[in-house]
Amino acid sequence: MSLFTRPFLRSPRQFSVARYVYWARSPALRSNLRIPSIAAASLRAYSNESKTGRDAPPDKKSKKLSNLKYITERDSLLVQTNNIFTKLKINIRWFLKKSTRPFNSDDISAFISWILVSNIFIFIFWTTTFVSLILYLINTVFAQEYLASKIGKFITKNESLSIVFESAIVPDWSSGKISFQKVFVSRRPKVSRGFTKGSQQDALQRAKLALSERILVNQQDFDNGNYTQFDLTIDQVDISLNFRKWINGKGILDEVTINGLRGVIDRTHVVWKKDDDPKNYLNVYQPGDFEISKFTMNDVLCTLYQPNGFRPFQVSIFNCDLPQLRKHWLFYDILNANNINGTYDNSMFTIHKKFRTDDQHQDPTLLWKQMTRFRVDNLDIDHLNAGIEGPFGWINEGRVNMIGDVLLPDDDAASDSLQLTEILTEIGDRLIKKAKRYTSSLPLVGPGFSPAVDEIDPNDYFIMDFSLRLYNVKAEVPLFTSGLTYINSALIRPIVGYINSHRTYIPIKCRIVKKKSDFEGSWTIYDSYLMRDLSAEAYDAFADYVADDEKRTLRLRRVGFWSLQLILQVILMSLGAIA
């Protein structure tokens, strides 16, 4: 600072106040001001005295001690004023630029630039903190509804939703998130769309009526939209924002936590065209689709109403932990969850990570180290046979246990050429089997044909081992089998007969190999064709069971005929010996 003030201090103009710093030459003054002698000798030139004054006798210098009592300009100005606002102005100027002169245009532009750059820096690296601070400052009683409308539209970018916030938007700085308290979310064609602040009581009453009155969703004046509709109440939603993701077109949401979700999911108005393809309903990617880095959900209970007069049932989720949740890969991310557990129509289901350690008892044929296990216990079979062709569509009674293992290749598989070759061969064999199933003639697939192993990337394929256990099932011969060939139609009656004769317990094991691209834009088990592939694998398993059962029956007949022939020969030989 002395470099900037030197031209002003050496000016011949005399100032009415003491200079910036006065270093005394007198030992008495140095001891009074507690100034070290070394420092005093180095900067004596900053004194406001003239040369004759410095050479004056000591008695004249002692008279000026009272005028040199204050070290800085700020101290002198603070003593000269009694107004608290003037003192505040002096302190602010001194704190910002270590000077008491008025602000000029350069100072103001520097301050504005500093404020803008610092706020941009905070917004980029601490987006949630910046937004929560803005919300805290403008979240007054009059601005709450306007703020809820703008924030809701910016976060969801969905004009078809009606969202009501009963409580204010509260920034939670302890967890670094923004909290929405008591939220009501609705999607109905006759409900006003928008984001408002209001009461949650209407949503609670609608949810309670839906749980007790089955005819609620069938009322003529309730809804008639051809899409999934819902009325949901949420106790608390915590979100964190990420500016960098928003710039990259991945949505501004970074982490989302949902607690206490209740409501109704109504699909009674959903209709499909005849021979409609589920692939027509895949999500079309758009820049800005959310890609949540971490999704957590706890304490969920919903009532689900299915189309075609299917009975309503409840779906509950105790806790859900997803490492990522992307709108364009929704179903695939759910299958790769860290942990999901709950009930589906009073049937327990779990999705969790399963790891195998490298121990000496590990099966060498197991080529995959990491997997995600999906398990459903004691599920009613009518959830699988609704509108499905194949063996599941023929079964109209019974229960099923399902276990599915989503397999991921080992990280060390790339270094082991033999293991990688086995993985690629497995994928190639499954693809050939799938091609034979859906193609009537395949001339390239013959005894000497082998898949191009080098052209297959294991990371591009989705592998799932399915294990199904059917209990107390009952099947009927379908009236129309337009989706099956003549040869496959000939096996319908044997398969139905086998199911009814072994209805107590039927185990089915199969492996499904699909490309990961089949799950792009998929939200359900149907539009990803996973249900179709599962039904086809179950058909192949039943066909193998029927063939094995026929071979076993033929073998028993031959053994019985041979035993009867042997007994007759022994009897004839005995009669000959007696005669």
Swiss-Prot record:
Topology Mitochondrial intermembrane: residue spans: 136-558
Q: How does it sit in the membrane?
A: Multi-pass membrane protein
Q: Where does it sit, as one GO cellular component term?
A: mitochondrial inner membrane
Q: Which GO terms describe its biological process?
A: intracellular monoatomic ion homeostasis; mitochondrion inheritance; mitochondrion organization; regulation of cardiolipin metabolic process
Extent of the transit peptide: 1-47
Where would you say this protein principally sits, based on its record?
mitochondrion
Residue spans crossing the bilayer: 115-135, 559-578
* Domain of life (superkingdom): Eukaryota
Q: Which residue spans belong to the Mitochondrial matrix compartment?
A: 48-114, 579
Keyword annotations? Membrane, Mitochondrion, Mitochondrion inner membrane, Transit peptide, Transmembrane, Transmembrane helix
Q: Where in the cell is it found?
A: Mitochondrion inner membrane
- Sequence similarity: Belongs to the MDM31/MDM32 family.
What's in the misc comment field? Present with 1200 molecules/cell in log phase SD medium.
Q: How does it assemble?
A: Interacts with MDM32. Participates in a complex of about 600 kDa.
Q: Which PANTHER family match?
A: MITOCHONDRIAL DISTRIBUTION AND MORPHOLOGY PROTEIN 31
In UniProt terms, what function does this protein have?
Involved in the organization of the mitochondrial membranes and the global structure of the mitochondria. Also required for mitochondrial distribution and mobility as well as for the maintenance of mitochondrial DNA nucleoids structures.
Name the UniProt record assigns to this protein: Mitochondrial distribution and morphology protein 31
**Species name for this entry?**
Saccharomyces cerevisiae (strain ATCC 204508 / S288c) (Baker's yeast)
Q: Which gene encodes it?
A: MDM31
